[in-house]
Regions:
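Glycine/threonine-rich phosphate-binding loop and adjacent beta-strand/alpha-helix elements that clamp
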Residues: 1-218
Length: 218
């Protein structure tokens, strides 16, 4: 980008596409790409293509036929700095956010007749007059001591022998002590999702949430 670009509202993707299956899904993601190629997802949108005209009356696709579909992403307010790039990614799955189609589908997207519509916020001369928000008002933070640090991870494991993919998400809030009441608190969530390639009936998901409390002898 040669200059900053600000968007406010829902980005929209209009795709001219065809499918080799009667049921298919399309997922679109808008990302901010830094000069070092690190990416940050900004917003996304999903559409079951049998819902392209109505969520009430489903219409299977005719394989090979071209359709024009509109995917609206989630509303967002974002500034893309000059020097960064804006990336649009398109896929037929976005698991585990959305359950896959019953049969793997291949979509053909015709780029010349497809487009991305960004809700660009025009520059307003009065922008410089807008004062920043004051510091938020709220209760004072807990008087606590960190005993064990937090840990977050997102790991994808592929077993080529079993043709199996596994996703493990860990959100460990660590262990801390609330000093005013001498209470130790620990919280950890582990999510596991697994499926065998091309066998969507094998999809499984499990979430374990552990919370522990300790004070004195208990």
């Amino acid at each position: 980008l040669e200059e900053d670009v600000e968007i406010l509202g829902p980005p929209v993707v209009e795709l001219d596409l065809s499918s080799n299956q009667s049921v298919a899904m399309v997922a679109v993601r808008l990302s901010d790409i830094l000069p070092d190629d690190k990416a940050t997802r900004v917003t996304y949108g999903l559409l079951n293509l049998t819902h392209r005209n109505s969520h009430e009356h489903l219409e299977p696709l005719e394989p090979g036929k071209r359709y024009r579909v509109r995917i609206q992403m989630n509303d967002i307010a974002q500034r893309f700095p000059a020097g960064n790039r804006i990336r649009l990614a398109i896929s037929t799955v976005y698991w585990p956010l959305a359950w896959p189609s019953p049969t793997p589908a291949r979509l053909t997207v015709y780029r010349k007749t497809s487009r991305l519509i960004l809700p660009v916020r025009p520059v307003n001369p009065r922008d410089k007059e807008v004062r920043p928000f004051a510091p938020p008002e709220g209760a004072p933070p807990l008087n606590k001591t960190l005993i064990q640090p937090t840990r977050q991870s997102w790991t994808v494991i592929r077993d080529l022998a079993k043709d199996e993919s596994r996703l493990e998400v860990i959100n460990d809030e660590g262990v801390y002590r609330i000093e005013d009441i001498d209470l130790e608190v620990a919280s950890k969530v582990i999510e596991n999702y697994v499926f065998c390639d091309d066998d969507y009936d094998s999809l499984r998901g499990e979430t374990k949430w552990e919370r522990r409390f300790k004070r004195g002898a208990w």
